[in-house]
Swiss-Prot record:
Gene name of the encoded protein: Z
GO cellular component, one term: host cell perinuclear region of cytoplasm
Name by which UniProt lists this protein: RING finger protein Z
Domain observations: The RING finger domain is essential for the inhibitory activity of protein Z in transcription and RNA replication.
Family: Belongs to the arenaviridae Z protein family.
Amino acid sequence: PDTTYLGPLNCKSCWQKFDSLVRCHDHYLCRHCLNLLLTSSDRCPLCKYPL
C-alpha cells in the first residue's frame, strides 16, 4: 500500500501520530516502539541500522 502520505509525522512501526518521535536511519519511531524494539535487539528491524 502507498504510505507516502503518512510522512515523517508518524511512527513507522505503529503508524500512529505522536509528538515525541525519534529519528531512526531513514524513518521515525515513537518512544514506545523504540523502547519495545530495544528490549529485543540493538538494531532496528525495519532498516537494520543500530538504534
